[in-house]
Regions:
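Boundary/linker elements of alpha-helical solenoid repeat scaffolds
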Residues: 66-81, 110-122, 151-163, 200-219, ...
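Hydrophobic residues within the alpha-helices of tandem HEAT/HEAT-like
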Residues: 112-118, 138-139, 150-161, 177-181, ...
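HEAT/HEAT-like alpha-solenoid repeats
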Residues: 84-94, 123-138, 165-180, 205-238, ...
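Long alpha-helical repeat scaffolds
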Residues: 364-368, 373-687
């Protein structure tokens, strides 16, 4: 291959190369280039539209600042004399933290305030306003953990605050609670019911104030009770029907499919609604014997009042009378009541609709649909039951029972005072419809769980209510199964009948005894025989009060119920045996009441035993005082009672001689009543 050589003079490539020019001097033959010298400053060519670029060695002096709150790390504050949490947070720090955007920080703030309350004695009394007002906005918080912490916080707080101290804050807390019950989220509404339950226990009168205005446009006051009841209507999907009823229109049965609640959520709503209605409709006899069923038995109001006062309280104690015992009312309210009572409408086809009847009509569609959905799971034919659905059915029937008990009680009162005996109740068909749906599930069996037995007891009382209100349209088809159930319960399974169930069955017992039907005499025989088998003192108290009232019914002149079949010669022997068993119960109760072995935990039982002894003495005195009694033979009764009452005063022991009975340790009023009984019986109490 030929090589070309470059001639610099002629600027041409030559071949062969000139003489004296070697190949290594040619520029293409591997000549090493010289390195360019380093440049101190490189000039950058500016680009169009970019502006002047900063120098590469320029120093950036700009800075950014961000404020963060770290109260727990503030080392400049002296907190040695301030109440702090384990994280060294004061109350002011926690109050600021309740507004934090993080839900975890808000929850920690609530638990921190609870820690301060439970740790430092007197801290709650000094900071009541701050502790309550700070936590109120968190009742309707969007986070479930914050709401759970708030429920726990107020549970401890309200249990420690006296009622008079909490009274100024009740309205604010009720307002925030009713607002949370109307929240767009159903979960917030459900959790707000926990706070409502606390308020119903703490301030029931304020929480249920003017609840009737939710169903009556005449009450225009915007009260707490109205807002809470309207929130319940919205939860159950009957708000539109309630608004129509409030305007005086007919509340149609509306669909409730728009409200999607699970079984547990609906149970929570119904449990809170039942508690709210119990507090709203409370009366003096809500926790005692249900005497409403006896209202139609007397033609004279004075006799009814005297009958209701029997065993109501100890008549041996003097109660001071003050002007506070007189109920107050404004003049125009008294005048309106007098004028309404004076008006007599002769052309009345149905009884006027009360607030309770209107409420039952509004809730009927929702309650009945839920009941029909839950009954198959709660009362399965094979005996199995779902706990949630069983509780759901229980609270549904309790609400029905509470409403219809009040409706029919007021109806019986109006019949007695206004003489409207033939006026029916407008919505009695709804109660009959309910019983028609419950009838197939009422087997009359007392075997199974306690919940099933309690459901049967509620069914029996609903049957008695419907029978008392319907007269000629009485659901007689339900009575035979009820009679069989009562007979089985009294004769075969004594352990299943508690004092609460016995008390709930009293209206049913009275319905059976006062109605001329086959089997009522057998029920009275079973009641008298069951009394001798009772071992529980609370059940003894309830059973004695009921049977004693039945025994004293013939002594009232205005009695308008046919009870003569209850005092036939065959039943007189059973009554005689029953009254002769009372001295033994008297001695047992008096001995337990004055026993020195009674511990402090059973002081309430001792007081109940003393009350029972006083009532037995009062009944014996009322029975023995008249020379003639429609039920008992006076001479035979006095002769047989004398040796049975004597152990109350003294006992003849074969070795120890005369041993004093519990009489000397009884309170003085009880001793005076015992001495009054002894004056009618030939024994001496002073031995």
């Amino acid at each position: 291959m030929k090589a070309l050589y470059y001639n610099e003079t002629n600027e041409k490539f030559l071949w062969p190369p000139p003489f004296g020019l070697s190949l290594r001097h040619h520029p293409f033959m591997g000549t090493k280039r010289k390195a360019k010298p380093a440049v101190d400053f490189k000039k950058t060519k500016p680009k169009l539209g970019k502006g002047k670029q900063p120098a590469s060695n320029a120093t950036d002096t700009s800075f950014k600042a961000k404020a963060i709150a770290m109260p727990q790390q503030s080392i400049m504050l002296d907190r040695s004399q301030t109440a702090t949490t384990r994280r060294r947070q004061t109350l002011n720090d926690l109050i600021q933290q309740t507004h934090h955007p993080s839900s975890g920080a808000r929850k920690d703030a609530v638990m921190g305030m609870l820690e301060l309350v439970t740790t430092y004695q007197g801290f709650l009394e000094q900071n009541t306003t701050s502790l309550i007002n700070t936590a109120l906005p968190l009742i309707g918080d969007d986070d479930v953990h914050v709401r759970a912490a708030i429920a726990r916080y107020f549970t401890n707080l309200l249990a420690s605050i006296p009622d008079d101290t909490f009274a100024p804050y009740a309205s604010s807390m009720l307002l925030m609670t009713s607002s949370a019950m109307s929240h767009i989220s159903m979960f917030v509404r459900i959790d707000a019911l926990q706070i409502l339950s606390l308020l119903l226990d703490k301030v029931p009168s304020i929480a249920t104030q003017d609840w009737e205005s939710a169903l009556d446009a005449k009450h225009s006051s915007d009260s707490h009770g109205q807002r809470i009841l309207q929130a319940f209507f919205a939860m159950l999907g009957v708000a539109a029907g309630a608004q129509r009823a409030r305007s005086g229109l007919v509340a149609t049965s509306l669909s409730t499919t728009s409200v999607n609640l699970s079984a547990s959520q609906r149970l929570t709503v119904l449990r809170s609604l039942y508690k709210f209605l119990c507090q709203a409709m409370r009366d003096s006899q809500s926790h005692g014997m249900p005497l409403w069923c006896f209202q139609s038995a007397f033609a004279s109001p004075s006799d009814l009042e005297q009958f209701e006062q029997l065993f109501h309280h100890s008549s041996l104690e003097a109660h001071p009378w003050t002007i506070a015992h007189v109920p107050g009312a404004s003049t125009h309210v008294v005048f309106e009541n007098l004028m309404s009572a004076a008006r007599v409408d002769q052309s009345v086809d149905a009884a006027p609709e009360s607030i309770h009847e209107r409420l039952a009509h509004v809730l009927h569609a929702s309650l009945l649909s839920t009941l029909l959905d839950s009954l198959p799971a709660a009362l399965a034919p094979d005996g199995s039951s779902s706990e949630v659905h069983a509780d759901l059915v229980m609270h549904l029937l309790r609400i029905y029972l509470l409403l219809w008990r009040r409706i029919i009680t007021l109806h019986i009162k109006s019949r007695a005072t206004q003489g409207t005996n033939d006026v029916p109740i407008k919505s009695i068909t709804q109660l009959e419809q309910l019983l028609a749906h419950l009838g197939p599930y009422f087997t009359g069996s007392i075997d199974g769980p306690h919940v099933r037995l309690e459901l049967h007891v509620i069914y029996c009382e609903l049957v008695s209510l419907c029978t008392m209100a319907a007269h000629e349209r009485a659901p007689s088809k339900h009575l035979p199964s009820v009679l069989a159930f009562l007979q089985t319960l009294l004769t075969q399974n004594h352990a299943a009948l508690t004092h609460n169930l016995y008390q709930a069955l009293l209206p049913t017992f009275w319905l059976v005894l006062s109605t001329p039907i086959d089997g009522n005499v057998d029920i009275l025989f079973a009641l008298l025989a069951h009394f001798d088998t009772v071992q529980n003192r609370a059940l003894h108290m309830v059973a004695f009060h009921f049977l004693a009232r039945i025994a004293m019914l013939p002594t009232f002149r205005s009695l308008q119920v046919q009870v003569l079949p209850l005092y036939t010669p065959s039943l007189r022997a059973a009554w005689h045996t029953w009254i002769l068993s009372l001295p033994r119960l008297l001695w047992q109760s008096a001995t337990y009441a004055v026993s020195s072995r009674t511990s402090s935990s059973s002081e309430e039982e001792a007081r109940a035993a003393l009350t029972l002894a006083q009532h037995i003495l009062e009944f014996l005195h009322c029975t023995l005082l008249p020379a003639r009694h429609p039920l008992f033979e006076h001479e035979a009764l006095v002769t047989e009672l004398a040796p049975r009452v004597a152990p109350l005063f003294h006992v003849h022991h074969p070795k120890r001689g005369i041993v004093p009975g519990p009489y000397r340790k009884l309170p003085v009023p009880t001793q005076r009543m015992a001495e009054a009984v002894v004056q009618l019986i030939p024994i001496s109490p002073l031995r």
